[in-house]
Amino acid sequence: MRTSKYLLSTLKETPNDAEVVSHQLMLRAGMIRRLASGLYTWLPTGLRVLRKVENIVRQEIDNAGAIETLMPVVQPFELWEETGRSEEMGPELLRFTDRHARPFVLSPTAEEVITSLVRNEVNSYKQLPLNLYQIQTKFRDERRPRFGVMRAREFCMMDAYSFDIDKEGLQKSYDAMHDAYCRAFDRMGLEYRPVLADSGAIGGSGSQEFHVLAESGEDLIAFSTESDYAANIEKAEALAPTTERAAPTQEMTTVDTPNAKTIAELVEQHGIAIEKTVKTLFVKASDEVDADIIALIIRGDHELNEVKAENLPHVLSPLEMADEAQLRDLIGAGAGSLGPVGLELPFIVDRSVAVMSDFSTGANIDGKHFFGVNWDRDVQLGQIEDLRSVVEGDLSPCGQGTLQLKRGIEVGHIFQLGTAYSEAMNCGVLDANGKNSILEMGCYGIGVSRVVASAIEQNNDEYGIVWPEALAPFTVAIVPMNMYKSDRVKEAAEKLYAELTAMGIDVLFDDRKERPGVMFKDIELIGIPHTVVIGDRSMDEGNFEYKNRRANSKEVIEIANIVEHIKAQLS
């Protein structure tokens, strides 16, 4: 590609509204342009990268035995009513009606559509296993789109759906897709981790996320120092302490704490260890509890894991905190002074709190706390659950090593849906005995456009993007110095361009009438892995200059050897 016939669209300055590095560099490198909130046009440079991600994903998913299809972005609302997700998805599911007042949605995912297709097209176990996928535009009406294409309303996604006659078949399909994901991300040159995850709104049982490791990641992942165990912070189990509860050494006393509204203030003002405090949080209860709200009790230095909490049968899902008015009406005190002693509402205790003794907690009276509280003496220990998020140094749930935490960007997710959708939509086939059997489903997604942004988050420097070679918009750049003043420079550049393109290499030939400094900055910004600089001075000595973007190195290469040198770099 010649830059004179190409839309380069690079920017010198970083736009003010770009918060993360990938958003900044995608704008500056001329990859995307904002159309509206969460909506982006992909310019030629960005589209080249997007297509490379798509092609790698397509090849590996094909190799896993999946078959490509293409489904509509517009879906009938009635399909979503069949599974009950029409309300579960909330306002992120964009609804509209056509001219005949028929309700539709813009697709954020396609479980309903694919299940409807399979129940009409597949009728025998002999047609299984079946795995269908598409690479298609999706739409999710995000409340707060941010970070460019990382959290956009419209995005490109690969979504696949497997159908099997039994759970054993589902496990095989799931494992095949897991391995295909690993091969795809390996080929892309990304540092990533597959981690155990919560199934969320998609539903089902087994679930793993694939995270690209990056400091800007919105998710925390926990992994063992001594094994392959890794889990999203939402899923990582906090084991019960190995120590037994110590015997009481203090009597329970009531202490005036008028200025201690938070755990931090209580610790600072009264000189107690934060590990000896508990905090009591109130959330809306589910129908399984004979109360409107329920208390969740965790250690003062721990954080409530909201996903773990809302997965409990006693807690309303999605999680909803009780408001101040409810607390005062039911308990007579406000947040900051609440605790389990004398509480006439149900409560659940975290594992770490269950082994505490001589601890401090709110007295359910404004401005007062109990010190020296002990279970089964001052308050009965009730239901115990894992309520907290893990912290660095916790024992790994696998029994090997301790947990470390890193930030990650979720780029893929695989689910064992089981019969959650197929049963709701009556998707079954005749088995070997001639009986109707509801199909076991798997669901698999890769955020193709998000992969592009996450690769940049992981691969950049002060000059711009440093693409993994498999994703770069161009593999080689040719920069002829003062080409329009030197016939031999132009001739050498044209010859090299023809040779490399004939070999199937993506080449950007910078034939602009620009200063060399401008050319070099653009090529570094775009992140082209290999650059060949052609100039009169080097040609006088029979050489070209070769630059490697990732190594940030320069070499002088004989003109006769330049093609072989580039081939060696690419092999």
From Swiss-Prot:
Entries under SUPFAM superfamilies matching the protein: Class II aaRS ABD-related (SSF52954), Class II aaRS and biotin synthetases (SSF55681), YbaK/ProRS associated domain (SSF55826)
Pfam families: HGTP_anticodon, tRNA-synt_2b, tRNA_edit
An example Gene Ontology CC term for this record: cytosol
Complexes and interactors: Homodimer.
Catalytic activity from the UniProt record: tRNA(Pro) + L-proline + ATP = L-prolyl-tRNA(Pro) + AMP + diphosphate
A GO BP entry: prolyl-tRNA aminoacylation
Function: Catalyzes the attachment of proline to tRNA(Pro) in a two-step reaction: proline is first activated by ATP to form Pro-AMP and then transferred to the acceptor end of tRNA(Pro). As ProRS can inadvertently accommodate and process non-cognate amino acids such as alanine and cysteine, to avoid such errors it has two additional distinct editing activities against alanine. One activity is designated as 'pretransfer' editing and involves the tRNA(Pro)-independent hydrolysis of activated Ala-AMP.
Superkingdom, natural source: Bacteria
Keywords: Aminoacyl-tRNA synthetase, ATP-binding, Cytoplasm, Ligase, Nucleotide-binding, Protein biosynthesis
Compartments, as annotated in UniProt: Cytoplasm
GO terms for MF: aminoacyl-tRNA deacylase activity; ATP binding; proline-tRNA ligase activity
Protein name (record): Proline--tRNA ligase
Segment forming the signal sequence: none
Domain notes: Consists of three domains: the N-terminal catalytic domain, the editing domain and the C-terminal anticodon-binding domain.
Organism from which the protein derives: Aliivibrio salmonicida (strain LFI1238)
InterPro entries: aa-tRNA-synt_IIb, aa-tRNA-synth_II, aa-tRNA-synth_II/BPL/LPL, Anticodon-bd, Anticodon-bd_dom_sf, Pro-tRNA-ligase_IIa, Pro-tRNA-synth_IIa_bac-type, Pro-tRNA-Synthase_IIa_type1
Family statement drawn from the similarity comment of this UniProt entry: Belongs to the class-II aminoacyl-tRNA synthetase family. ProS type 1 subfamily.
Main location: cytoplasm
Taxonomic lineage of the native organism: Bacteria, Pseudomonadati, Pseudomonadota, Gammaproteobacteria, Vibrionales
